[in-house]
Curated annotation (Swiss-Prot):
KW Transport (keyword) present: yes
InterPro entries listed in its UniProt record: Calycin (IPR012674), Lipocalin_CS (IPR022272)
Record carries keyword Transmembrane helix: no
Record keywords: Olfaction, Sensory transduction, Transport
A GO biological-process term: sensory perception of smell
UniProt similarity note: Belongs to the calycin superfamily. Lipocalin family.
Protein name per Swiss-Prot or TrEMBL: Odorant-binding protein 3
Subunit structure as annotated in this protein's UniProt entry: Homodimer.
């Protein structure tokens, strides 16, 4: 593999991991917000 191919694959995985982590945090915060409103 050339260096450019490795860099491209690493970049794609990095983007996927960032998107996944960001999505999970949004879902967690959203669930907690609904839970708190439900209690009050």
């Amino acid at each position: 593999h050339s260096h450019s191919e490795v860099s491209q694959i690493s970049g794609e995985w990095y983007s996927v991991l960032l998107a996944s982590d960001h999505r999970e945090k949004i879902e967690y915060n959203g669930s907690m917000r609904v839970f708190v409103e439900y209690i009050h």
